[in-house]
A protein has these predicted regions:
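Surface-exposed amphipathic alpha-helical tracts and adjacent flexible/coil segments at the periphery
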Residues: 1-249
Length: 249
């Protein structure tokens, strides 16, 4: 078969599926991405994992950006250091948002809390979503109104949920202008051609997918000449019919 660990992933988790039971197709509604799990996020379980003997953590990095690696490893490194010092790392809502913005199809503990398939697999989308802002309250000629769950500034990337059943397309673009409205709501406007507002509807879910300020900060951290460098000696042994063996010293 095609191994994702060898760069040959068939992307089965990104595809919609149908269920046929006793010859009849089951109405799944929006829940069509049956193999698309939420991302395993165990940052708040680090002390427990170390306590039970976990000695190494693997963080998904395949097809991810350098900014993602800098962001996620930074948060996990802090959690590990705090755990070794006998303290539990505190993750603020902003910390979690930063991790979600780097890449997230929703966070879950996977099977670390036992079996809960409905939490592990939502099934209603298969792409990166980021931070859920809320639902569209109203649609105007040049933008939408909603009460966002977190701060939105000009330049932020957004995506609006689509609906395959009704033909409502998924759309995304960058915010051009943010206008304050009443009762904590804001009006978001977009650049010309970025989002077709006529195709947006009240009740549509809105997600924040990118924060330019966060991305710029992460890129600066990658260019920091004072960043700690560690010498690493790798020795690899490959033989036909045997597993690849790599030692790091």
């Amino acid at each position: 078969g095609r191994s994702a660990n060898r760069g040959e992933c068939a992307q089965a988790c990104r595809m919609p599926y149908e269920i046929v039971c006793d010859g009849e197709e089951v109405d799944l509604g929006k829940t069509q991405y049956l193999l698309s799990p939420q991302d395993l996020a165990a940052h708040d379980l680090i002390p427990e994992l170390i306590r039970v003997g976990v000695a190494s953590l693997k963080i998904e990095g395949r097809l991810k950006s350098p900014e993602y690696v800098a962001n996620i490893t930074g948060h996990y490194r802090r959690a590990i250091d705090e755990a070794w010092a006998g303290r539990a790392a505190e993750f603020s809502p902003r910390d979690v948002e930063e991790m979600q913005l780097s890449f997230s199809r929703g966070f879950s503990h996977g099977f670390l809390d036992g079996n809960n398939h409905k939490v592990l697999v939502r099934g209603d989308y298969a792409k990166k979503r980021g931070v859920y802002l809320g639902a569209v309250e109203s649609v105007g000629r040049s933008g939408v109104r909603l009460a966002p769950s977190t701060l939105v500034k000009p330049g932020a990337g957004l995506v609006f949920d689509g609906d395959d059943q009704t033909g409502l397309p998924e759309q995304g673009g960058r915010v051009y202008e943010v206008l304050n409205a009443k009762n904590g709501a804001v009006e978001l406007r977009f650049g010309r051609g970025a989002v077709d507002v006529s195709l947006l509807r009240p009740g549509q879910g809105v997600w924040k997918t990118d924060d330019p300020e966060l991305t710029a900060r992460l890129r600066r951290s990658l260019e920091d000449p004072s960043a700690r460098m560690v010498d690493l000696d790798l020795r690899a042994r490959a033989a036909v019919g045997e597993p690849l063996r790599v030692e790091a010293r």
